[in-house]
Amino acid sequence: VCDIHLHLLALSESNGCYVNPKFRRSLVYYLVNLFTDLPSSGSDEERDRQYVENLDGLLDTPFKRHCAILLAMDGVYDSSGELDLNKTPFLISNDYLFQVCSKNQQMLYPGASVNPYRRDALDELERVKELGAVLIKWIPNSQGIDPADKRILPFYRRMSELGLPLLTHAA
């Protein structure tokens, strides 16, 4: 069994992740904490570590037949291709994703996230493929991506050439 929709959550900026202070005060953030295994106490680093341990526990069955594509989440980028932290609700870095997946390669497969408006989008696409990404993940309305934007056609072409499918939310 492979559950393609498993989100990596993280709070600590020490692992390249980010949670916007406004988002930390939102109802969505409260609900994420309520309905996930994200611990409610401890430092951000301790909570991140405990969350990953909880994920491992979910997949650690006697038959070792479960796997998951673990998903990163890129940020919002401005018109010059720079990360806009003010508009980014949260960011789960590809580097952190690969770090977590490398500890359990039999059960966790990396689903990277690359916003096509990044200045280095094509380079990042190549990099994550080389590191073992099995797909690219977007949430267009949260990442400021217009999937019909003709400016991102080269990104789609390169994704196709690399054999990377796109997993995306419609709302």
Predicted regions and their residues:
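Helix-coil boundary/capping segments in enzymes
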Residues: 1-171
